[in-house]
A protein has these predicted regions:
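Short, contiguous alpha-helical
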Residues: 2, 7, 17-32, 38-81, ...
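Active-site rim elements
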Residues: 10-18, 88-95
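Residue-level signal for pocket-adjacent positions within structured domains
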Residues: 35, 78, 112, 116
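Acidic/histidine-rich alpha-helical segments that form the ligand environment
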Residues: 86-122, 129-143, 147
Length: 181
């Protein structure tokens, strides 16, 4: 590895942590905390997921693709159960569970090296590199965060205020650092 390879790897991992843990997760949490348990578990139709199911699904995905894989642990994910939750788990239980997984994911991302990003893994039966796994989690989390934001806006009829710092031109009035827990 060259110094440039290490720098690119460090930039990729830093950006991934900031996006996942400093932006998507806090905003998703804000959305969910604004909903009632009934809203979290409501589905507009049988083909759609509830926010509760999406939270269980994100927990399973982040745990499988980051925590379990990079720690070389046995994968015990039961993906179908994420969409068939039989009971209305309280919002606090859902958020605590995902928060625990996100803290573990943060620890994993903080210690990864360029060698880890290039190393081979098998996830969901697919041969991938560590880089693939990190990218998949950030992209996948962003997709479902967007769905949850949309559902929250639809149910509440309110602007979530995530971009209130932007001017009319879409630019920040001042630079704001995104903190990673």
């Amino acid at each position: 590895m060259t110094a440039n390879d290490r720098e690119v790897s460090a930039l990729f991992l830093d950006f991934s942590r900031r996006k996942l843990l400093g932006q998507y997760w806090p905003r998703l949490r804000k959305c969910v905390e604004s909903l009632t348990v009934e809203q979290v578990w409501s589905r507009p139709n049988a083909a759609s997921n509830s926010v509760g199911n999406l939270l269980l699904h994100l927990d399973g995905n982040v745990r499988q693709w980051l925590v379990t894989s990079f720690n070389r642990q046995e994968d015990r994910r039961d993906r179908p159960s994420e969409f068939d939750a039989p009971e209305l788990l309280p919002v606090s239980v859902l958020l605590d569970r995902l928060d625990r997984t996100m803290r573990e994911a943060s620890d994993v991302l903080a210690r990864l090296t360029e060698a880890d990003l290039l190393a081979p893994y098998e996830i969901q039966g697919y041969p991938v590199r560590g880089l693939d796994a990190v990218y998949q989690v950030v992209e996948h989390f962003g997709l479902h965060y967007g769905q949850i934001s949309y559902i929250t806006k639809t149910l509440s009829g309110k602007d979530l205020g995530f971009y209130s710092e932007l001017s009319k031109t879409g630019r920040r009035e001042e630079q704001v650092a995104v903190r990673v827990p």
